[in-house]
A protein has these predicted regions:
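Short SAM/SAH-binding signature in class I
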Residues: 69-76
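Class I S-adenosyl-L-methionine
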Residues: 62-63, 68, 80-217
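S-adenosyl-L-methionine
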Residues: 34, 38-67
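Short helix-capping segments at alpha-helix termini
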Residues: 22-23, 45-51, 91-93
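Conserved SAM-binding loop of SAM-dependent methyltransferases across substrates and taxa
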Residues: 11-24
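Short glycine-rich anion-binding loops that position phosphate/pyrophosphate groups of nucleotides
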Residues: 10, 77-80
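Conserved SAM-binding motif I beta-strand of class I
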Residues: 26-31
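Conserved class I S-adenosyl-L-methionine
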Residues: 1-10
Length: 217
């Protein structure tokens, strides 16, 4: 357990759970909105964790002390917003473990991470309320690396052997097939866009087929 920051903590359930389980020694729980932050304070107080969890009104990581921080969690928002939050403190994130859970725009976030000196260490997928999401573990290395279309789309999620990862990949395939259908039906078709969607859908089918084969062995 280390010292973490939960950005956009909402009701404060996550930092409370992390401290109670011993996964974190202490947490800084932040939110940009006073209402949710009041709820988080109440949750912390009801669990008797005021000594280990500090709550603070903040926009992303702006104005927060990052010295001694081991982990930063940014979950439950769009990939573009997560990238914007990180972009304002990039050079101070060396040695910090990032756990990022984009609700939307995951490909954008992966592209941004690769292009701004972050390495994606691993991904784990989760299904909640019938929707599948990826949780991205990343770290700042300073080395910018290429992010081809397939990697932007799936990241390291195929390495996750859990059932939720299969659901996540099937969701991505469904979206690509829907996108391809729309592109083909367009009054002014985009050949490059169609070719890319066809390629991504084919790759996703291959990944899913390989997973099924491995399961059957």
């Amino acid at each position: 357990g280390g010292r973490g920051i939960d950005v956009g903590t909402d009701h404060g359930y996550l930092p409370v759970a992390l401290v109670q389980s011993g996964a974190a020694l202490s947490m800084l729980a932040t939110d940009v909105r006073p209402g949710p932050l009041d709820s988080a304070r109440r949750c912390v107080r009801e669990n008797g964790l005021e000594g280990q969890i500090e709550t603070r009104l903040a926009d992303g990581l702006d104005g927060l002390p990052l010295g001694g921080i081991t982990d930063i969690i940014i979950a439950g928002m769009g990939g573009q917003l997560i990238a914007e939050i990180l972009s304002r403190r990039v050079l101070e994130l060396g040695g910090v473990n990032l756990l990022l859970q984009p609700m939307t725009q995951a490909p954008y976030l992966r592209q941004w991470l690769c292009g701004n000196g972050f390495a994606i260490r691993q991904e784990r997928c989760a299904v909640a309320a019938g929707k599948a999401y990826a949780v991205i573990q990343a770290a700042f290395t300073g080395e910018k690396i290429p992010c081809p279309p397939l990697y932007a789309l799936v990241g390291r999620s195929p390495e996750d052997e859990g059932e939720d990862a299969g659901t996540y990949l099937e969701t991505l395939l469904g979206r690509e097939e829907k996108r391809l259908k729309g592109l083909c039906a367009s009054a002014s078709p985009n050949p490059a866009g169609i070719a890319e969607a066809e390629m991504l859908a084919a790759w996703l089918r291959e990944i899913l087929a390989a997973r099924d084969q491995k399961k059957g062995e």
